Every structure is written in C-alpha cells, then in structure tokens.
Amino acid sequence: MADGPRQMTDEQLLRERFGFSEFRPGQREVLDALSVHGAALGVFPTGAGKSLFYQLPALRLDGVTLVVSPLVALMKDQIDSLHRRQIEAARLDSSLASAEVEDINRRLVAGTLKLLYVAP
C-alpha cells in the first residue's frame, strides 16, 4: 500500500484495510455526514456494519479513537478482526492482568494504537 490511510479514499480504505468491495446500504451516507458535520445518527440492524462508522474514520485521524462498549465478547471479536487487518487496537476491561494494562498504556504513550475499546 503506497499511500497511508490519510491519503486514501474511503473506498480504498474499505477495500484495502477492511476487505470489502463496496459499502453496504446507508454506510456511505453516514460516513459522509460524519466527514461534513462531525456527527451523525444512523439506525441500523445488528450485523449491518455499524462498526465501520468509527473504525474507518479512526484510520484517518491522528491519535487514538476511544470506543465504549458494554460487551467484552464483542470488543474481543472486533479487536481480533482489526488485528487480522493489521490495524492496531486494544481493550481495557476488568478481566485484564496488570501487565496487560501496562502494555496497553505503553502502546498508548508510544502512539501505536488506533482504537482503544473500553468497558464502562
């Protein structure tokens, strides 16, 4: 990949980083609204690709994107999926050992994480 994520179009990111050939219905409109207005409301059923609304923009932004999720199992699944796509992500929740938390803190300070999932 010659261009970094900040220089790629959303369609290129979708293909090259997420492995999809096209957006699902409604995704393009929500991403456009986020880009133009900084906020959007999208109501979609389970499995409709809502995670893309914060995962794709996270690749364009400097720093880390914080994702609050009450479901640890869902966080684990999403992080595993991101890792398969070579996207740096981690989670903070009460199940982690102190050494794991310290490692995540080091990665945050180093600026290597793009997404950090936290449980309330």
Task: Go through the PLM ranges and name each one.
Residues 6-10, 100:
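Alpha-helical structural motif
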Residues 9-25:
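Dynamic helix-loop-helix/coil hinge segments at AAA+ ATPase domain boundaries and subdomain interfaces
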Residues 22-120:
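Conserved P-loop/Walker A NTP-binding site and adjacent catalytic elements of P-loop NTPases
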